[in-house]
């Protein structure tokens, strides 16, 4: 009776169908020109990384995609610096234009430091993929602003070298090779300078005999004179030597009395 009254009054519960859930598949991979640009960026960056990145790693988040674009700009700068270094290495250092030699050395050193800094920034980006690191973004922004200028400010390079831990090595090899090439061009001997070798007879002739002090008793004041030992050693026969040893007392080596 209660059910009939409830149905007449509109209080009856009409059974509804259970809700069904359908998986919505969204294609996360870009299509067309965007896909080609991402593949080009991956090709440029993966050549400088210890392990290559995949397209899934890049499109997983917007931050990773943004970092890939920045890494591509750094990779292009690195390639340009490497090409400049290869061209500058073909320069022959001569004395005709010393000012040009200094400019070439300066450009080679700056290009090498800029290339190392770009590579360090790319590696820093690679290590920060999947992590939220504001410091990395700041470093790369500063790097991109610096490399976008027509003239590179080396003070910014020094700051980034200290931040990324890149040590600038002195370019001493250019001066050594420069001096070596000039010496060869002049026909000079570039070997080590050694003193001439003296013969045994020459060495013996240069040996100075020792000097001894001799006291003179003939004068009122005792004076000491220095004579070489060669002048006090006359050549005696064996018989004369035996006579001197019997009649003359032992004479000290340090003093000889002259009569």
Swiss-Prot record:
Highest taxon, organism lineage: Viruses
Post-translational modification: Phosphorylated. Palmitoylation is necessary for Golgi localization.
Any one annotated GO CC term: host cell Golgi apparatus
Keywords: Host cytoplasm, Host Golgi apparatus, Lipoprotein, Palmitate, Phosphoprotein, Virion, Virion tegument
Pfam family, one: Herpes_UL51
Residues lipid-modified (S-palmitoyl cysteine): 9
Record InterPro entries: Herpes_UL51
Localization, UniProt: Virion; Virion tegument; Host cytoplasm; Host Golgi apparatus
Subunit structure: Oligomerizes. Interacts with ORF53; this interaction mediates ORF53 localization to the host trans-Golgi network (TGN) and subsequent incorporation to virions.
Family of the protein in this entry: Belongs to the herpesviridae UL51 family.
Free-text function comment from the UniProt entry: Plays several roles during the time course of infection, including egress of virus particles from the perinuclear space and secondary envelopment of cytoplasmic capsids that bud into specific trans-Golgi network (TGN)-derived membranes. Localizes its binding partner ORF53 to the host trans-Golgi network (TGN).
Name of the protein: Tegument protein UL51 homolog
Species this protein is from: Varicella-zoster virus (strain Oka vaccine)
